Amino acid sequence: MTSRPLMTLQVEVPPPQKLGPVPHGTRVIAPITGGVFEGRRLRGKVLPGGGDWTLLRSDGVLELDLRITLETDNGALIFMASFGLRHGPPEVLAAIARGESVDPSKYYFRTFPRFEASVEKYAFLNRMICVGAGEALPDGAIHRIDEIL
């Protein structure tokens, strides 16, 4: 199986909304207030209004459920839904929770984004499978997204 880079996506996240314990774990909602993305075939900004509905499971794994709207540099809107997992050693996850920068090789942060585009120029996004590797930042995250060929 081969892949090639699709884009690098950086999202801005203010302090999250902590719902607390729910039947399947601990729910935290992280609003997405903006960001940028850039790749060989598309670039633009992340519109405010999306979010990452995370669930911290009892085994320490964080389930990610990111849903955002991308606006390309020529005004096209693209919906992106990305699901994934983040986990690692307790001391590394504690450092991330404190807002510290942590080497992304020290923890697992993988996603599988899907896209919906109505503009023909970006319709190729509707027909691909992608994978991403994430990096937690003090005020958001960076996702390096590859398309599977």
Regions found by a protein language model. Name each.
Residues M1-L149:
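Beta-strand-enriched cores of mature, soluble protein domains
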